[in-house]
Amino acid sequence: MKKLSLALVGAGGIGTTVLREIREGRLEGKVEPVLVCDRHPEKLKRIERWFPDCDTSTDLDDAMSAEADVLLEAASVEAAASLLPDALKRFDVIVMSVGALVLEEGLLSRCREVAEVTGHRLHVPSGAVGGLDVLRALRGRVREVTLTTIKPPKALNKDVSERTVLYEGSVRDAVRKFPKNINVAAAVSLAVGDPSLVTVRIVCDPEVSVNTHVIEVESSAGTYRFELRNEALPDNPKTSAVAAYSAVALIERMTEGIRVGT
């Protein structure tokens, strides 16, 4: 089978995890990186050692001209908003900074329009949570969803001495106030299909050492509760390791003939 060619925007924790899996893991022999963009030149030096034939750039615009099958955005909400929807004219796109689709007014609908014309797809990985397949299956039957995210102070850049509720409210305001920490809320709302059904609660707790997400669902088909306690990436306390692995899994799925899950 022909290798999947990949353009990557963002060589941080998630991007580096994906590249490591291409080099010596579950994506080895299946995926070929053709371009890596990052605004920090020092991060690109390691990539150049790993993949001598892969182009690197500090200019985001170069990603749009890459000869790739898939573009993976793993940089920031700002980068995602800059790339979309135009990137869908050239590639399938995997977006990790899902908050951009909620925060930027009209961006999601513009992405849909471009995807319908070009046939390219916008992929939203599960990220740091599970249960998105259930939420998608229940679309139209959900009465309410509550997402509680609990993180240690270092993950939220807060200095608190006791468990503190930092925010409770809508998905859009949660993403606006915590853009680097709350892509989970955006992914949940996209799976549900109606952000107004989702209430987000963000808690800072000095007694915890891992990122925890609790999703509680009331629907006509049943009541559901998902709790995930995620270790952070060693070099990025704001990102759950499983979020990076979800990107790896989605890319791997693109190379396989059998797909498991909704």
Curated annotation (Swiss-Prot):
Pathway: Cofactor biosynthesis; NAD(+) biosynthesis; iminoaspartate from L-aspartate (dehydrogenase route): step 1/1. Its EC number is 1.4.1.21. The gene is nadX. InterPro entries: Asp/hSer_DH_NAD-bd, Asp_DH, Asp_DH_arc, Asp_DH_prok, L-Asp_DH, NAD(P)-bd_dom_sf. The lineage of its organism: Archaea, Methanobacteriati, Methanobacteriota, Methanomada group, Methanopyri. It catalyses: L-aspartate + NADP(+) + H2O = oxaloacetate + NH4(+) + NADPH + H(+); L-aspartate + NAD(+) + H2O = oxaloacetate + NH4(+) + NADH + H(+). The keyword Oxidoreductase applies. Keywords: NAD, NADP, Oxidoreductase, Pyridine nucleotide biosynthesis. Belongs to the L-aspartate dehydrogenase family. Specifically catalyzes the NAD or NADP-dependent dehydrogenation of L-aspartate to iminoaspartate. This is L-aspartate dehydrogenase. GO terms for biological process: NAD biosynthetic process. It comes from Methanopyrus kandleri (strain AV19 / DSM 6324 / JCM 9639 / NBRC 100938).
